[in-house]
């Protein structure tokens, strides 16, 4: 099958005419036979397990079920490419054509498109300038509508009539002395189609513009709304009566598959059930029309056909929802398209990409701000091509297959090579929803055990992340350019300020604030090690780690730097035998020699405050 490449700027969705729907599904075979219309509700033959002809999986309409093989088996193999079998009429080609070849169902009676009837706003009701309730009554055979009042004095165009009113008028028309002529009334989608066909869009638009100029308030707003719809129909070249369907497209069979399960049973797409309902009711209606069945029976069948098509297009939009086994609502065409799991958002706007992973995030308090903890299991998958390349380059293996075998065996050498590979190779972390540019940032990966991604707590506000089960995605930039860009522009430590406000977005919160408070808090109660003197801050930390002092105990530590304090009062002065003078303040001790020169300074603090101060000094490299 030749590949067709065509560049386009955008996709536009509009109304399809009946001719265009036929064109999608109709094909002419070399023998002149036109195929494309699905006329039977059958799917596959339960004995041969082959698709039924003219059914929902017909090979003549949609293409062969097996590559290069016709339905009857006369032609097999690729050498018969392009031949159409004289016996079964199936073209010998690839089976993948069943993913794009369409069919169609020719309806025995027109039906309205439920989107245009029941949508908000209802375009059908807006165009006809009628209340939606009235249009619904016509469509679902609850009321007649006057299509042509003729010479009847009390009838008006588009007037609704009940069954009794119409019988009364009918009696008047067919009475012997009747003068009434040209009176036409209709019911169902056919009547709505006729009303839409009678609309002259250009004339209607001109009349509306004139009326808008002299109107005010709510009436003017209503007229503008109607004019906007009419202008859109004119601009797109669509006809209003195309909102009433006479032909329904049947989507390709591989997009609504039927799969055989282990026990011999079949699992099928809900669409097949919905299409089957439409075909059954359509065939029944055609048969009733052929045998000239009573009008009431035909009308009931038309209503049922309308409901079947409604369920196919948008199940549950109007009337009772069609359910399958276990009372589960069947998924209609609309359900497949719309929502988060729909075709657009799931498959077209968002796709799965290579070199990416996803896992739950947990806090990594020992990480630096530009680092993230990447699980080994995930890292070896993401960086596998790089690891294989390095293994071959270092001569540890000879080929890719041997390298993969080494990785599968979890050989210890793999982790050493992986450490070398990820060193200096940033990864991108993204948390959905990405509402601003800081929703995706670069980090240097650090290999960790477990299966959770570790994240520095300071970058949480930028991602709007917390650790109650949030998940994040990891992406690996492959090219040198993308790695450089990630390092220079996207590294977390380079994104301190919010792009929206210019204020710092990296601010400590919750656990960090509580931790800082706990470290620096004072406890007036007596604690272990209280009043002890230490020669340096390192001695204090060592004593705390050995359990000799508690975190909040008041201790004295020698400190030679400047100290800001509130000791304004006069100190208590002590003099030792060797002539040294000590000034005693509430929060510090100053010792001077005989010449008044400061020898040492001890300050009153807690191990917690020393640890806090020491950590900040080390991180700032003071």
From Swiss-Prot:
InterPro entries: DNA-dir_RpoC1_gamma, DNA-dir_RpoC_beta_prime, RNA_pol_asu, RNA_pol_N, RNA_pol_Rpb1_1, RNA_pol_Rpb1_3, RNA_pol_Rpb1_3_sf, RNA_pol_Rpb1_clamp_domain. Disulfide bonds: none annotated. Belongs to the RNA polymerase beta' chain family. RpoC1 subfamily. SMART domains: RPOLA_N. Its cofactor is Mg(2+); Zn(2+). This is DNA-directed RNA polymerase subunit gamma. Pfam families: RNA_pol_Rpb1_1, RNA_pol_Rpb1_2, RNA_pol_Rpb1_3. It comes from Cyanothece sp. (strain PCC 7425 / ATCC 29141). One of its GO terms (cellular component) is DNA-directed RNA polymerase complex. NCBIfam families: PRK02625.1 (NF002729), rpoC1_cyan (TIGR02387). Zn(2+) binds at residues 70, 72, 85, 88. Its EC number is 2.7.7.6. Mg(2+) binds at residues 466, 468, 470. GO terms for biological process: DNA-templated transcription. Keywords: DNA-directed RNA polymerase, Magnesium, Metal-binding, Nucleotidyltransferase, Transcription, Transferase, Zinc. It comes from the Bacteria.
